[in-house]
């Protein structure tokens, strides 16, 4: 017991000595680093924090500081979860229209589902599938030959493969993609040398398989030549089901929900997904506001207050990043208000950092990501330009009319399209 007391005493003495030393060092530093704590010193964290004469927070201020910590952590988590909530909303759309099974696909073309998509166009037909590999085991996706362009991505919208015309196979033949999670074993009997399958490993439980039928007038049912099945059923795969919204159906909006609904959906997503290494700090932040893996979401009144404020501020930050990006690579021309909305690397990495702002910028309003979506050369893929303000720099206003000037000989090998979207949903405006 004596030794314990002695150690504690030494630690206390060391702490006091360190404080005194810091005071001495600071007093000899440049003016910008001088700190003279006193009882009247205040820090604005949205609320005033009083410090005592030693520079410590007053005891009655501790809860206010923790409130601010949890609020800032929730805002950070809100932004970090943007692509997950994007694709989880897309999955919810598929389920809403009936495509709930691992081999079910949602077909979207000239129907109410298209109006609820994030920034689509009305030219192509979309096919989407969300298989849960934790349930099904490794899955096979047979991409049909023909004029399609698609992607295989994980639920954080990280690229894993291009399919169709923009793949190395250029849509000339059926290609079998064998998709596994990073920890699933390669099935017995796979001979990599025979190239029967393109092997794709993803870092989430669910995979997003999507492609566009680029010429639905010429080949209206090309997407239904897709074949999806668990590898374990490859010898006798079951027929796929293709679902499409009826003209009389309501529109399901896949955009990220707002307010507390955002956090409820994020909690739901976390329960069925694995935690990636890069997510662990976010998970710690979420735990402080009542969102944990394996536990129900029952936030306290204090946590609800923090979450509501964080959702409001997080959404405004996302709008700012998406509609007024500060990334230099977003600029199209110095004399134009048009921008490149997609500046996110397919890996979400840029040297030593993750591209947080570029990730929020793109995934708040759109989905899909690949180098071929940033091609810049006709015939090599696609390129996207966006405008949020008029020629005088004013935000677009739905109550006003605008004239869109198109230069002759638009550089497009297959087609170009102009679409107009609502700010609230990032969905198409009705005709």
Regions found by a protein language model. Give the residues of each.
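Bacterial N-terminal signal peptides that target proteins for export
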Residues: 1-10
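A compositional/structural signature for long, glycine/proline-rich flexible linkers
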Residues: 23-431
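Generic low-polarity alpha-helical segments
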Residues: 1, 17-23, 209
């Amino acid at each position: 017991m004596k030794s314990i007391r002695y150690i504690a005493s030494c630690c206390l003495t060391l702490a006091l000595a360190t404080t005194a030393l810091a005071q001495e060092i600071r007093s000899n530093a440049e003016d910008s680093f001088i700190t003279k704590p006193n009882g009247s010193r205040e820090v604005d964290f949205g609320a005033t924090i009083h410090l005592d004469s030693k520079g410590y927070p007053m005891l009655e201020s501790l809860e206010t500081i923790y409130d601010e910590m949890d609020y800032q952590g929730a805002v950070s988590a809100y932004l970090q979860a943007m692509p997950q909530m994007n694709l989880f909303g897309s999955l919810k759309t598929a389920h809403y229209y009936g495509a709930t099974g691992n081999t079910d696909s949602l077909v979207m073309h000239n129907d109410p589902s298209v109006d609820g998509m994030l920034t689509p166009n009305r030219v192509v037909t979309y096919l989407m599938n969300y298989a849960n590999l934790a349930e099904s085991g490794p899955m096979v996706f047979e991409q049909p030959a023909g004029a399609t362009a698609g992607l295989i991505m994980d639920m954080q919208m990280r690229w894993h493969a291009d399919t169709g015309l923009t793949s190395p196979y250029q849509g000339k033949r059926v290609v079998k993609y064998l998709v596994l999670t990073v920890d699933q074993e390669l099935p017995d009997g796979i001979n990599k040398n025979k190239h029967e399958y393109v092997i794709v490993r993803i870092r989430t439980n669910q995979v997003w398989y999507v492609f566009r039928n680029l010429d639905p007038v010429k080949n209206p049912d090309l997407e239904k030549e897709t074949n999806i099945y668990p590898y374990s059923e490859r010898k006798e795969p079951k027929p796929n089901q293709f679902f499409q919204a009826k003209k009389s159906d309501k529109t399901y909006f896949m955009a990220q929900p707002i307010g507390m609904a955002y956090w409820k959906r994020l909690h739901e997503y976390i329960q069925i997904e694995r935690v990636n290494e890069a997510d662990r700090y976010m998970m710690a932040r979420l735990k402080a506001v009542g969102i944990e893996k394996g536990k129900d979401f029952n936030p306290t009144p204090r946590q609800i207050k923090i979450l509501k404020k964080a959702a409001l501020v997080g959404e405004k930050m996302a709008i700012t990043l998406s509609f007024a990006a500060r990334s230099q690579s977003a600029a199209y021309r110095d004399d134009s208000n048009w921008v490149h909305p997609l500046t996110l690397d397919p890996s979400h990495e840029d040297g030593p950092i993750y591209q947080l702002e570029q990730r929020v910028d793109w995934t708040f309003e759109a989905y899909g990501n690949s180098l071929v979506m940033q091609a810049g050369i006709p015939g090599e893929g696609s390129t996207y330009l966006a405008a949020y303000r008029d020629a005088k720099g004013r935000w677009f206003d739905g109550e006003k009319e605008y004239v869109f000037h198109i230069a002759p000989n638009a550089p497009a090998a297959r087609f170009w399209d102009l679409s107009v979207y609502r700010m609230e949903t990032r969905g198409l405006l009705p005709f």
